[in-house]
């Protein structure tokens, strides 16, 4: 029964949660900055696709481990008329050569990868020396009272939301993986419980 839930319910649930208006608005703040050859980690159902600036990107590739979500993303790409190559795989072991992407886009993905440090190290590896990581992630809140609730809720949340963690630091993890965080804005998302709503977004360059 668990595999049925993970295969059929979790993709639908993630698509619903990640298409909430406050989250979509956050996507619109960073995705248009992508340029050149672009890799999106954890493409999901393709919710970022409408925000890519076609005048800036030369090609778009996406990595997504979930087959149902890959199908959704292909359908979204077809509706948008946007060519994209979506590959199955895990962010911790990217099937790409070193130093080939101008931009890596990572939105609401680091919360659910098995090893965020390895995923970020791989993102750094596949970026060109002058490339950029564009990120928009939810994670560990700065307020102690909120963190207490995040830690209480996280075990149940992980079980029902495809392994999504609530207490992973965002910008600090990116810096620890060998990036120089160039800009980072933060806020609690509106109309979202604080335990799920702490958001950090910006850009980082290989250090």
Describe every region a protein language model picked out.
Residues 39-41, 45-93:
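Class I SAM-dependent methyltransferase SAM/SAH-binding core
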Residues 117-129:
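A short glycine-rich, Lys/Arg-flanked "PGG" loop and its adjoining helix->strand segment in the class I
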Residues 179, 186-207:
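Core SAM-dependent methyltransferase catalytic element
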Residues 17-37, 47-51:
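Conserved alpha-helix/loop element of class I SAM-dependent methyltransferases that forms part
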């Amino acid at each position: 029964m668990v595999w049925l839930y993970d295969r059929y319910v979790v993709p639908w649930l993630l698509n619903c949660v990640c298409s909430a208006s406050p989250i979509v608005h956050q996507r619109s703040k960073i995705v248009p900055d992508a340029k050149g050859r672009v890799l999106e980690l954890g493409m999901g159902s393709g919710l970022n696709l409408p925000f890519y600036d076609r005048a800036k990107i030369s090609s778009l590739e996406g990595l997504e481990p979930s087959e149902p979500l890959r199908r959704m993303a292909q359908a979204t790409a077809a509706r948008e008329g946007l060519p994209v190559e979506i590959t199955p795989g895990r962010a911790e072991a990217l099937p790409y050569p070193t130093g080939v992407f101008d931009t890596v886009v990572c939105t609401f993905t680091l919360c659910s990868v098995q090893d965020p440090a390895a995923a970020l190290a791989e993102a750094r590896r596949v970026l060109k020396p002058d490339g950029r990581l564009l990120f928009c992630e939810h994670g560990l809140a700065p307020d102690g009272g909120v963190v207490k609730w995040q830690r209480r809720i996280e075990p149940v949340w992980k079980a029902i939301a495809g392994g999504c963690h609530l207490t992973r630091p965002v910008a600090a993890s990116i810096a620890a993986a060998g990036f120089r965080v160039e800009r980072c804005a933060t806020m609690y998302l509106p109309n979202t419980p604080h335990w799920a709503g702490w958001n950090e977004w910006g850009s980082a360059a290989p250090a």
